[in-house]
Amino acid sequence: MAHRLQIRLLTWDVKDTLLRLRHPLGEAYATKARAHGLEVEPSALEQGFRQAYRAQSHSFPNYGLSHGLTSRQWWLDVVLQTFHLAGVQDAQAVAPIAEQLYKDFSHPCTWQVLDGAEDTLRECRTRGLRLAVISNFDRRLEGILGGLGLREHFDFVLTSEAAGWPKPDPRIFQEALRLAHMEPVVAAHVGDNYLCDYQGPRAVGMHSFLVVGPQALDPVVRDSVPKEHILPSLAHLLPALDCLEGSTPGL
């Protein structure tokens, strides 16, 4: 007779799964620039940030830790390059803006808890599930979660900066399992990124659920993920867990 699967550990992505920026990034950057006497279009800053972040992540992955950078310096460089790409060539004028933005994005008021997130976390705890965070965030995450009243829900918060490996590297998931003293078969991960949050945990034998944001899911991703693993909202998580636990392990 087959044993019933029981999930005991739920690990969570944070950005765009539990939290999001209170204001669009381009607007936040433009507002801070305006306070320092610079007028820059939010759309140009948004586009510049995407390019700068992608290039920095490629050249210095995981905050450049293996290159001797700190996450703070990594982010300051991203902001400087963002403004450069948006047409601001005066790095000296941007430097204090970058410093202030780093502080602002460390503050809980810059972020907002997504609808249903706190209720879902509370219901998971009521069920007896252990909860933890696995995030590609930096060292500021603990303070942000604490300021928003979410830290108390988690046994531990594991960032890629602390672990030394970013998702989807299998080692960050293995480290979380080690910290929790759990086997992968009784653990599941929840997040919004297909590679980092869906495929990554499955590579080490965990289960996973993909949270769908306001944008339509890429057709290739949609076709490769069973519909019972897709969460249109966090309110769908507990029913999806019930469905998973009603299945036969290994099938």
From Swiss-Prot:
Keyword Acetylation: yes
The UniProt record lists the keyword Magnesium: no
CDD domains, alphabetized: HAD_dREG-2_like (cd16415)
Top-level division of the source organism's lineage: Eukaryota
Keywords, in A-Z order: Acetylation
N6-succinyllysine PTM sites in chain numbering: 15
N6-acetyllysine: residues bearing it: 15
PANTHER family (UniProt xref): HALOACID DEHALOGENASE-LIKE HYDROLASE DOMAIN-CONTAINING PROTEIN 3, PTHR46191
Family from the record: Belongs to the HAD-like hydrolase superfamily.
This protein's name: Haloacid dehalogenase-like hydrolase domain-containing protein 3
